[in-house]
Amino acid sequence: MLDLQNVNFGYSRHRKILSDVSFSVRAGASVGLVGESGSGKTTLLRLLLGLERPTSGTIRFGDDALDPADGAFMRRYRRAVQPVFQDPYSSLDPRQKVLDIIAEPLQSLRIAGPRKDAVAQALEAVGLPLDAMQRYPHEFSGGQRQRIAIARAIVARPQIILADEAVSALDLSTRIRIVELFKTLSATLTLVFVSHDLGVVASLCEEMVILEKGQVVESGKTRDILTAPQHPYTQRLLASIPRMPA
């Protein structure tokens, strides 16, 4: 579904952020991109969203190369691929009601159909009541706001969710509930989950890609990497990062 081959990215020859990144994401898979701050994982997510263009290398969605300059392709791609960002406090417009926030992709992607019905289905999927439509973000807790952000991501029925540190700004108990929500959604969607927290990825993703200083140092089945990490960087991550309950 997503295939990266020898992807490089940098702002100059002397400031390289990603080096020869190659991996694939199968349809229906849940894949964690794991690395510490500065590993390049958020930059990689920006490339996957089409917000940046690789310096070299290719990102493919199905049979097509991802080209941010191709407007027609990007409209199709953005319908198929939706993001969830880190901070539920800053990612929602406080001036808008929840109905308008969640419905935004329907409008921007020109998706026809009853707007309220689609929003109601998205709210139900994330466990929020229908009366949330007429309320504002400040009326909700952090966990509820992230549920609103997830509802916005799924309202257009995408094929892939790209989540960037989507639980790191939440308290532990809320984090566990949102991870469980992502786990439920991943049964019908492809999920790429960016996190510095190996424990979160271990509880959520069946596969993982480990990034260190812009390079893939290890990838494979999550259980295999956790059981027998091969790279010293992965071994250090496994030893130092607290794990969430499975």
Regions found by a protein language model. Give the residues of each.
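ABC ATPase NBD coupling module
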Residues: 66-82, 96, 100, 108, ...
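Conserved ABC ATPase "signature" region
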Residues: 114-131, 238-239
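ABC ATPase "signature
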Residues: 219-220
